[in-house]
């Protein structure tokens, strides 16, 4: 959800309601298309900073009061009315007030970790990968499950990044076609893109970025 900060008031193209409708429609269409492959599908979602319920630009409720999680729930709830379709999917996302804002998922001998990335607040310098690595180390030090992931996935910073040192840390690109904030604070040009990769016992393979000059090129 955009326009959740004061400086974005006049830069958003859509209202809050329309953004939720677009997100919901996009998720549903992607899942329906993936279902045509005839493979079991696991849908996972974690809350990010733009989904937070805000007042005067500040989050003031709990971590699960988040539009990112709400949209995930809307998608699952809609699919439940088609039992034949619903059984093809597994939905995983935090929803209880006591849940963590990260997820882990075991696949082919790997433990995948998922975090939006807004919680990478300190340590590791100014680059996103350094912040992600410092955060990941601290999670392991605190004995949190996501800290033991050998493949950590995050977003938030809009551009693709990757580090293997020795755990694999992957920053996914965004579809928005650019973030003025990231460009001005990190010097990174953020191109619209979709990240995909495969998993086997050896880890992540076939890492691919479907990248275009603009999100409009994905139509």
Model regions: which residues?
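Core catalytic region of metal-dependent phosphoesterases/phosphodiesterases
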Residues: 1-81
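Charged interaction patches that mediate protein-protein contacts
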Residues: 2-9, 207-219
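Catalytic phosphate/metal-binding cores of nucleic-acid and nucleotide-processing enzymes, i.e., regions
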Residues: 21-24, 43, 105, 213-219
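Conserved beta-sheet core of the metallophosphoesterase superfamily
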Residues: 35, 64-99, 108-210
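Acidic carboxylate-rich catalytic motifs and surrounding loops in phosphoryl-/glycosyl-chemistry enzymes
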Residues: 40-49, 89-101
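Short, solvent-exposed polar/charged micro-motifs at secondary-structure junctions
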Residues: 54-55, 102-107
